[in-house]
């Protein structure tokens, strides 16, 4: 199934998703997680994430032209770049010094429990925020839709 967003003039639209604080989502499955003990992981999954990144991925899956922007740490950006290339998402993130935020999910399927651990994010400077503001201004165009999503 393919969905295309069209205006009254039948021109295809572009959606810009803005994710100020994207995250690498690490999901670790551990059956019978025991706190204070050594546990053996069953699996590890790492995905590019953040609300706006997830929205962009879904839109791209439906064939909708999508641009992503926000602030992305230079360290840990590879998973995002790979996803954007694979899904043909136009990457316009402003790269900033530091590591992209990581969120760890510890999933215990035996108990049906999930524990979330959210790590700190790279700190944006005034120059980073000015660069993002300029990027947003450059992306503003008639017929473009913007989705602002996620945490600051």
Segments and roles (model prediction):
Residues 37, 61-145:
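Conserved N-terminal subdomain of the carbohydrate kinase-like
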């Amino acid at each position: 199934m393919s969905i295309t967003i069209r205006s009254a003039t039948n021109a295809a639209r572009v959606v810009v998703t803005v994710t100020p604080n994207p995250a690498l989502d690490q999901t670790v499955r551990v059956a019978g997680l025991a706190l204070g003990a050594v546990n053996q992981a069953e699996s590890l999954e790492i995905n590019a994430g953040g609300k706006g990144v997830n929205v962009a991925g879904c839109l791209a899956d439906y064939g909708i032209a999508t641009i992503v922007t926000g602030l992305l740490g230079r360290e840990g950006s590879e998973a995002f770049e790979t996803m954007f290339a694979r899904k043909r998402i136009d990457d316009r993130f402003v790269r900033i010094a530091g590591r992209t935020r990581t969120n760890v999910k510890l999933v215990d399927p035996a108990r049906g429990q999930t524990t979330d651990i959210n790590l700190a994010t790279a700190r944006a400077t005034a120059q980073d925020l000015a660069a993002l503001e300029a990027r947003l201004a450059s992306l503003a165009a008639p017929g473009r839709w913007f989705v602002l999503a996620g945490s600051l």
